[in-house]
Swiss-Prot record:
Lineage of producing organism: Eukaryota, Viridiplantae, Streptophyta, Embryophyta, Tracheophyta
Keyword annotations from UniProtKB, A to Z: Pathogenesis-related protein, Plant defense
Family statement drawn from the similarity comment of this UniProt entry: Belongs to the BetVI family.
Gene Ontology MF, one: abscisic acid binding
InterPro entries: Bet_v_I/MLP, Bet_v_I_allergen, Plant_def-hormone_signal, START-like_dom_sf
PROSITE patterns the record matches: PATHOGENESIS_BETVI
SUPFAM superfamilies noted in UniProt: Bet v1-like
Protein name: Pathogenesis-related protein B
Pfam families documented for this protein: Bet_v_1
PANTHER family: OS08G0374000 PROTEIN-RELATED, STRESS-INDUCED PROTEIN SAM22
GO biological process per UniProt: abscisic acid-activated signaling pathway; defense response
Domain of life: Eukaryota
One Gene Ontology cellular component: cytoplasm
Length: 155
């Protein structure tokens, strides 16, 4: 299995606690409202929202993909850390085994925070994820971050 890793970070005037809640804990209900073209809906297949929960996400018309199945790997409300894996769906392109996503909101001295996102692509065999796909994933994470941040500032 091949492994490729990508990291991106962004700063916000929103507190780490509030941004963590919006980006991670409330994302299933918030994202279809703030970016309706990105995600249509999310349905829980197993679990209660905590670690081990499996969700089927129906992506929106703005996405080149239709669905993805996610599994919640870790939630740490004390350190504002959230991890999930994409374990199925056309987003895996047939040559990716899974995609691990890790988000952390780190409090800043000014009351805002820095959001750090790490994406790990686990490929089948020695397949390589093209750079444009990695860039697309990073851009999607930043787009989601900016949309949720704007919503939280306005509300």
């Amino acid at each position: 299995m091949g492994v490729q890793k990508s990291e991106v970070e962004a700063t916000s005037s929103v507190s780490a606690e509030k941004l963590f809640k919006g980006l991670c804990l409330d994302i299933d209900t918030l994202l279809p409202r703030v970016l309706p073209g990105a995600i249509k809906s999310s349905e829980t297949l197993e679990g209660d929202g905590g670690v081990g929960t499996v969700k089927l996400v129906h992506l929106g018309d703005a996405s080149p993909f239709k669905t993805m199945k996610q599994k919640v790997d870790a939630i740490d409300k004390a350190t504002f850390t959230y991890s999930y894996s994409i374990i199925d769906g056309d987003i895996l392109l047939g040559f990716i085994e899974s995609i691990n996503n890790h988000f952390t909101a780190v409090p800043n001295a000014d009351g805002g925070c820095t959001v750090k996102s790490t994406i790990i692509f686990n490929t089948k065999g020695d397949a390589v994820v093209p750079e444009e796909n990695i860039k697309f994933a990073n851009d999607q994470n930043l787009t989601i971050f900016k949309a949720v941040e704007a919503y939280l500032i306005a509300n």
